[in-house]
C-alpha cells in the first residue's frame, strides 16, 4: 500500500450532486497540492458553485468523496473543515465591529487557542495589509479593504487550503492588483482555489486551471498546459483573402473569425479535420496561403472552445 501524499491537500473523487432528476455535478475528480493556486472556471450554471459548496462541507455530495489533507469530509467533517479557510463571494463581515473585534471573533470560531489568538490576529492583518486599520469599523472601510478583512478571516487559523470565490469583483484596478498580489503570496504557504469569471486573472495568479461545464470537468492542466492546448482551433493566414463566407463554406469548417494581418481563426466542425480542404480551397481560389497551423491557446480560447462547442454542434 502506498504511503499517503503529505503534499496533497485536496482530493475529490467522482464528486456528484443531484437535485431531483438534474445532475448538477457529474463525477468530478481532481487533486490539489501544497503551493498550488488553482483557477476554477465555468459558465453560469456549470456546477462550479455546487462543487465549491461540497469542497467546503456546506453541501453533502450525492455520491463521491472529498478528502482534505487525507481527512474524509463526511466521516470527520469538523476536522476536515478546520483545515479550510473560505471567503464567499459576499464576505461574511460584521460592519459594526472593528477589524480587530471581527478577527478575534473569527479566530475563536476557528478554535484558535486563546493564548495564540492575539498573535494570529496580528499575523493575518500583516499578511493582508490591514495592520493599520485594526481599530476602524469594517463598515467604514473601502470595498478593497473589506475584501482584505474577508481574506484575513479565512487564513487566521493558518489553514492548509484557502478557497476564494470571486475575490476581486467590484474592486477598482489598484485594489484588484493588490488582492492578486496577496493571492500569489498565499499560494506560497497554502493551497489556494480561486473561483473567478475574470479569465486574465487566472493567467496572472494561478499555476493550475480547471474548467467545469454542464457538471463535468472538461479541462484540467497547468498554466503552461493551457498554452500548449491545441484544441480544435486553426490559424489560417491568407495574403489574398476572399470574403469570410467563402472560408466558412469549406467542408469541415464550423465557424470563422477574422483576426488580424490576413489571419483567420477557423473552428472545425465536430469530428472533422478541414486542413486538406482548406489547402485545396486556397489553391483553387488563389488565396495565397501563407500559414495554416493549430492556434496557440490562451485561457479564453480554451474556455470558449470547451464551453461553446456543444451549443454550436
Residue ranges and their predicted role:
Residues 2-4, 270-313:
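C-terminal coupling/interaction segments
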Residues 7-12, 17-213, 219:
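ABC transporter nucleotide-binding domains
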Residues 34, 132, 240, 268-270, ...:
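Non-catalytic surface loops within mature trypsin-like serine protease
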Residues 129, 252-257, 288-293:
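A short linear hydrophobic-aromatic micro-motif
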Residues 178-269:
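ABC transporter nucleotide-binding domain
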